[in-house]
């Protein structure tokens, strides 16, 4: 039985820039370095692996969604770090969320489950 995704691995053109971006969002570097070809960052139970691919050009679209406790707190922290997320949206499926694109074109979404949706899932 599958329980959950343990990590997402993303190609990056420049490791220092990518590590800076993810640490600005609250991730902690747990393996690797700005000079490494592969690094891992963690926030809660979520792991993001970065693999160096200097000539990387996204040829497809995808989105990684992170569940957060408070979407407004993270949104405000991202803005305070100089990042430019889209405005917080209210999804009809019971989440508040915002999207943000990393320096390599990967779309990230940060979503907070609203109480009524949490009751349906619980």
PLM-predicted stretches and their roles:
Residues 56, 93, 113-117:
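A short acidic/small-residue loop/turn micro-motif
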Residues 15, 64-107:
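Vicinal oxygen chelate
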Residues 35-37, 58-60, 92-96:
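Short acidic/glycine-enriched loop/turn segments that link adjacent beta-strands
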Residues 48-51, 99, 108-111:
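Conserved beta-strand in the GNAT
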Residues 2, 9-48:
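Core segments of cupin and vicinal oxygen chelate
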Residues 41-45, 100-103, 113:
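Active-site beta-strand termini and strand-to-loop segments that position acidic
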Residues 1-16, 64, 112-122:
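N-terminal beta-strand motif that seeds the catalytic metal site of vicinal oxygen chelate
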């Amino acid at each position: 039985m599958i329980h959950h995704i343990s990590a997402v691995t993303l190609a990056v053109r420049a490791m220092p820039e990518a590590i800076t971006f993810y640490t600005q969002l609250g991730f902690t570097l747990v393996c690797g370095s700005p000079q490494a070809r592969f690094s891992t960052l963690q926030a809660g139970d979520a792991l993001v692996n970065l693999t160096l691919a200097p000539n990387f050009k996204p040829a497809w679209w995808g989105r990684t969604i992170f569940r957060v406790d408070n979407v407004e707190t993270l949104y405000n922290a991202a803005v305070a770090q100089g990042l430019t997320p889209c405005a917080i949206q209210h999804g009809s499926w019971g989440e508040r969320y915002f999207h943000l694109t990393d320096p390599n074109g990967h779309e990230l979404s940060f979503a907070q489950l609203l109480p009524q949706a949490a009751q349906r899932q619980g």
